[in-house]
Amino acid sequence: MDSRNQLIVAILLTSACLIYCAQYVTVFYGIPAWKNASIPLFCATRNRDTWGTIQCLPDNDDYQEIPLNVTEAFDAWNNTVTEQAVEDVWNLFETSVKPCVKLTPLCVQMECNSTSTESSNSTSEGSTVPEILNETTSCITNNSCSDLGSEEVVDCRFNMTGLQLDKPQQYSETWYSKDVVCDTTNGTSRKCYMNHCNTSVITESCDKHYWDAMRFRYCAPPGLCLLRCNDTNYSGFEPKCPKVVAATCTRMMETQTSTWFGFNGTRAENRTYIYWHGRDNRTIISLNTHYNLTMHCKRPGNKSVLPITLRSGRVFHSRPIINERPKQAWCWFGGDWKKAMQEVKQTLVKHPRYRGTNDTQKINFTQPGKGSDAEVVYMWTNCRGEFLYCNMTRFLNWIENRAHPQRNYAPCHIRQIINTWHRVGQNIYLPPREGELVCNSTVTSIIANIDMFDNQTSITFSAEVAELYRLELGDYKLVEITPIGFAPTSEKRYSSAPQRNKRGVFVLGVLGFLATAGSAMGAASLTLSAHPGLYWAGIVQQQQQLLDVVKRQQEMLRLTVWGTKNLQTRVTAIEKYLRDQARLNSWGCAFRQVCYTTVLWENNSIVPDWNNMTWQEWEQQTRDLEANISRSLEQAQIQQEKNMYELQKLNSWDVFGNWFDLTSWIKYIQYGVYVIIGIIALRIVIYVVQLLSRLRKGYRPVFSSPPGYIQQIHIHKDWEQPDREETDEDAGNSIGDSSWPWPIAYIHFLIRQLIRLLTGLYSVCKDLLSRSFPTLQLIFQSLQRALTTIRDWLRLTIAYLQYGCEWIQEVLQVLARTTRETLASAWRDLWGAMGRIGRGILAVPRRIRQGAELALL
């Protein structure tokens, strides 16, 4: 019996635990969590030149950053922000420096003569004494520095149909010798074609444009955010950056395009650091600003460019030579380059990815091998719309102090046909503009590949222009805020949930929304009452900022790709917010910050640590469960709506006014009419059946005729009976006048039939009740016995529990009494001992005095 009772108690306790310890899915809206995004960004700039303002929005410098106590993965090469920067700078570059279409007709044979045999790219061995230039060197101003010869050019003539289409006309044009392909005849006159004639297909007209260095920043669309790794040890790839800040916009970035070096960058600091690709040897090295590294480029000369008309609508630019330096240019480098390059080597040795020699004497700067594209072999840069190709051989000799001619300047030449740096192909540009061209830049970075072999390390300059923008923006990443989260709680929908404390949140737009990203889940959930409003306020704020700059910039109406992308960012966040609200509505949680549900949390192995885990960490663990949880919530909401509909139908009669609503009654009136019609039809069928059965037995129908019917009705003979003397003829009239009319009797008959019908129905119902009552009585008796058994069991269980509680109470009382007595006894003993010790100490002087007295006696 005792074991049985113990088993019952255990079952009850287990059931109670299952009921009260169950975990239910709770929907939180407004959590500080995010995921990687690839939505297009929009740009903002302070430049006011024509193409800059068309391509980007005006910059208002109203941007903030807040630190987040989280860790996040960053990769400068696998990055949406840097990929967009590369693509967008290419589009800006193509927009500002347009390829020219007027050269397409020159895919014809030309007769060319060389006009100069000197080359600026001279590789002949000269003096090994370094020739170093500075701002005061005289050859800079008069263009007389050594090793700077004239460019090799060819003067070509070709025939084309001009204004008169039936008569060919001869034209003249001067080319840089490397822009044409000629035969190998030994004579002074050669047959030549334009280089890349068959691959350069251009379909738009162009004018001569140029661009200066332009800076712009990227801004996240409303509802999204930019994260930045603020760790000084970040080197382009970091799985767990410990210092993360949130921002709405990036810093300003430079749009200079060049190979080998990066110019005027915004990431240069008073130190040297290296961004290293996570999987190969590609690097971008940021140079120390302390060494003040600069590059000054110059194209001397004063050359006129005169247009000639080939035919109507086609104008070609002729280039008659005025001086002896056509297309000639050169660049000299200022600053302490040798110390800067030595610091680069020392920084490379300390880099965690470096596995080569630690001896900086065996680390050398090298240029790419011959045979590559000109943009790889030479340092390629853009100077006011002109493309310079500079031979850096003697400059590298000077840096590495090699036993070869050393110069801190490099001869350059200008080309019209260049290889595109972002896509495969060639572009043809207009001839150099007239007059002298001067460009001054600050060298801020080096694009290089690190090659380690045979205890030697080569820092090979690279032509990966895109690496410049990975250095500029590689510490950023774009994330999409995911404000909806799921977590298990013990609260069930419609249960009495405890009141949540509200905590004020400072308003920083979307950045304020992420302010608690590093807090524990329990602390962050306390601010959810303010987060959705803050989230929406941040979206509205960003939308308003974007709308304001669009209104300030009327040139936006003329945009193509960039403008469309900028305008599309205005609807991105609204769509996301409405999509989130639609999801919440499908779960029955619309416009709620914390929404309890009736869906059980089935993954008991995945439980959040509310005191130590952030929402971002929790979301990463439960992201795979989101689809199943969402589907379960939708099914629960559908069932809840069905239940509510049925309950509303039952509760509609609780309102007294609904009883007078005809629409509520008409349905039941229809049911009543159907019942009456059914009873009447059934009665008619029964009567017809009975009538047919009587006819078969020989009875005459009751309603065969009125006279027959009257004959079957009892007639009172004492009413106006005729005299016996009357004749037979008068009998009929006397009968008709002295009898009851047959319709009245028929009504009496119907009344009797109706009474009989009702009596029959009453008998049937009474019989049905009499037969059902014993069955119901048995059911009620069984139910009564079951309730009695449950009552007795509950009484017994309660008695056991009371007995157990009384026993436990007695044990506790005995324990308390024993403890109290023990402590009291111990205290008395301790107090007595302390008293004896104290009296002994107080008696010491008396004992001393007594001893002294005895000694004196």
Swiss-Prot record:
Any one GO molecular function term: structural molecule activity
MPER: region residues: 649-670
Superkingdom of source: Viruses
Signal peptide (from-to): 1-22
Post-translational modification comment from the UniProt entry: Specific enzymatic cleavages in vivo yield mature proteins. Envelope glycoproteins are synthesized as an inactive precursor that is heavily N-glycosylated and processed likely by host cell furin in the Golgi to yield the mature SU and TM proteins. The cleavage site between SU and TM requires the minimal sequence [KR]-X-[KR]-R.
Transmembrane feature ranges: 672-692
Span list, region V1: 112-155
InterPro entries: Gp120_core_sf, GP41-like, HIV1_Gp120
Disulfide bonds: C43-C56, C100-C206, C107-C197, C112-C156, C219-C249, C229-C241, C297-C331, C383-C439, C390-C412
Keywords from the named record: AIDS, Apoptosis, Clathrin-mediated endocytosis of virus by host, Cleavage on pair of basic residues, Coiled coil, Disulfide bond, Fusion of virus membrane with host endosomal membrane, Fusion of virus membrane with host membrane, Glycoprotein, Host cell membrane, Host endosome, Host membrane, Host-virus interaction, Inhibition of host innate immune response by virus, Inhibition of host tetherin by virus, Lipoprotein, Membrane, Palmitate, Signal, Transmembrane, Transmembrane helix, Viral attachment to host cell, Viral envelope protein, Viral immunoevasion, Viral penetration into host cytoplasm, Virion, Virus endocytosis by host, Virus entry into host cell
Regions of this protein lying in the Cytoplasmic compartment: 693-857
Gene Ontology CC, one term: membrane
Region called V5, residue ranges: 454-461
Chain segments carrying region V2: 156-197
Region listing for V3, in residue ranges: 297-330
Pfam families, alphabetized: GP120 (PF00516), GP41 (PF00517)
Positions occupied by motif YXXV motif: 699-702
Segments for region (Immunosuppression): 567-583
Known glycosylation sites: 36, 69, 78, 113, 121, 134, 142, 159, 186, 198, 230, 233, 264, 270, 281, 292, 302, 358, 364, 391, 440, 455, 603, 612, 628
Alphabetized Gene3D superfamilies for the sequence: 1.10.287.210, Human immunodeficiency virus 1, Gp160, envelope glycoprotein
Motif (Di-leucine internalization motif): 856-857
Protein purpose: The surface protein gp120 (SU) attaches the virus to the host lymphoid cell by binding to the primary receptor CD4. This interaction induces a structural rearrangement creating a high affinity binding site for a chemokine coreceptor like CXCR4 and/or CCR5. This peculiar 2 stage receptor-interaction strategy allows gp120 to maintain the highly conserved coreceptor-binding site in a cryptic conformation, protected from neutralizing antibodies. Since CD4 also displays a binding site for the disulfide-isomerase P4HB/PDI, a P4HB/PDI-CD4-CXCR4-gp120 complex may form. The surface protein gp120 is a ligand for CD209/DC-SIGN and CLEC4M/DC-SIGNR, which are respectively found on dendritic cells (DCs), and on endothelial cells of liver sinusoids and lymph node sinuses. These interactions allow capture of viral particles at mucosal surfaces by these cells and subsequent transmission to permissive cells. DCs are professional antigen presenting cells, critical for host immunity by inducing specific immune responses against a broad variety of pathogens.
Other known facts: Some HIV-2 isolates have been described that can infect cells independently of CD4, using CXCR4 as primary receptor. These isolates may have an exposed coreceptor binding site.
Domain notes per entry: Some of the most genetically diverse regions of the viral genome are present in Env. They are called variable regions 1 through 5 (V1 through V5). Coreceptor usage of gp120 is determined mainly by the primary structure of the third variable region (V3) in the outer domain of gp120. Binding to CCR5 involves a region adjacent in addition to V3. The 17 amino acids long immunosuppressive region is present in many retroviral envelope proteins. Synthetic peptides derived from this relatively conserved sequence inhibit immune function in vitro and in vivo.
Protein name: Envelope glycoprotein gp160
